[in-house]
Regions:
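A short, exposed loop/beta-hairpin motif centered on an aromatic-Gly-Thr core
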Residues: 23-32
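Short, charged, surface-exposed hinge/linker loops at domain edges
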Residues: 1-3, 37-73
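Short aromatic-glycine-(Arg/Gly/Cys) micro-motifs in beta-strand/loop hairpins
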Residues: 7-22
Length: 73
């Protein structure tokens, strides 16, 4: 399975990695690589827990990420 991960610079240090398709699945790390490694482990644990509980595993649907520039008034 593949999931989109959003990486954001942390407020105080490092990076935060969020998985929009898996609500509440978030991790962090000092570097981007650390954050991605950690969130991969979080995704695996999240999916495993769903399967153990007999719950459906969310499947990501195709999405487009678009940046729009807007004028401030």
């Amino acid at each position: 399975m593949k999931y989109t991960v959003i990486l954001e610079k942390g407020d105080k240090f490092g990076y935060v990695a969020k998985v929009p398709t898996l609500k509440g699945c978030v991790s962090q790390g000092r570097t981007k690589a650390d954050a991605l490694k950690n969130v991969k482990e979080a995704i695996e644990a999240y999916v495993e827990a769903l399967m153990e509980d007999g719950l459906p595993v969310p499947v990501e649907v195709a999405t487009d990420v678009v940046k729009l520039e807007v004028a401030a008034k």
